[in-house]
Swiss-Prot record:
Keywords: ATP-binding, Ligase, Magnesium, Metal-binding, Nucleotide-binding, Tricarboxylic acid cycle. Binds 1 Mg(2+) ion per subunit. This is Succinate--CoA ligase [ADP-forming] subunit beta. It comes from Xanthomonas axonopodis pv. citri (strain 306). GO terms for cellular component: succinate-CoA ligase complex. GO terms for biological process: succinyl-CoA metabolic process; tricarboxylic acid cycle. Pathway: Carbohydrate metabolism; tricarboxylic acid cycle; succinate from succinyl-CoA (ligase route): step 1/1. Residues 9-244 form the ATP-grasp domain.
Amino acid sequence: MNFHEYQSKQLLAEYGIPVPAGKVAATPDEAVEVANSLGNGPWMVKAQIHAGGRGKAGGVKFCKTTDDVKAAAAKMLGTKMSTYQTAGVELPINLVLVTTAGEIVKELYLSILVDRGTKTITYIASSEGGVEIEQVAAETPELIHALNVDFVEGVQGYHGRDFGFKLGLNAKQAGQFASIMVNLYKLFNEKDLALVEINPLAILDDGNLYALDGKFDSDDNAAFRQKQLVAMRDKTQEDETEVTASELDINYVTMDGNIGCMVNGAGLAMATMDVIKLNGGEPANFLDVGGGANKQRVIEAFKLILSSDKVEGIFVNIFGGIVRCDMIAEGIIAAVKEVGVKVPVVVRLEGTNVEEGKQLLRDSGMAIIPADNINDGAKKVVEAVKNAA
């Protein structure tokens, strides 16, 4: 789950990490009220969407007067914005964040994440903040510093001070940096986060460090014990079909192709998409219907797939281990009838009660195309889509 900047800053502040004073507003007049409550300007007005790159897209404005604040908020609120991170998708701007604006002396980068390669929690820091860290890594990798945290020792103050001196900070600032690192480690663990990125972590004209922007990503598997984070979810920033799928507890990800996939098991689902690609097709989605699939679940999965008007064919690839193939077949037949499927449907069944499942499909009288294996199914669905075009 992703978070808005204002939500990230709220969490950072709760854990003692300095952030500029600010508050969100839903209307231009509210934005002016917030600005006045923060004292004399200048201020920053920032569009709240689940994406970076807002500045280049016109979503971050420096304002010297409250008239500027009102104009900036009016221009953003109620509109949609796309950035280089949204892949052309426009996200609605329902809120703006109004903050104080100090003069930036230096921009740094700091993040904490789970490094699967080293199997540790890892800090990444750089003296080059305010830009994409991938760009820094590619052009000046010597400016990137990493720390793999020992699970027994945890992160200590001396780790932060050492990092701070590597980034060119003075003794006072290195001490602040150490405090931020220690508090960030506590936040990361207590909130079951997968990533926290502060970019930039800036030195302002008062000589102190502030988190000017924050990007969070949480571990959805821990949502059951993170009620505060779940309450922060903004479904307006998410793909509508993916939101519906999450409410049905179906693992679904929208993609750009035209061949819908319904599979049980994440590994088999990824393999299915790969084989479709190898046969010249383009998957329209990742959909893991799960090991506990039943007839109604299969119907809902078909509805999810067909909610996209880009889908021109469907490949159902089921390995019946926990789930029974005959039950899946019943769900497919019911779904085709209920949903009114008008695109080619290719079905590959294997495993428990496979013969019963295949017989049900044959007896249904429906134009369901059987497949013997995953490659055969991928070839047939790609061919069926081409022939139907």
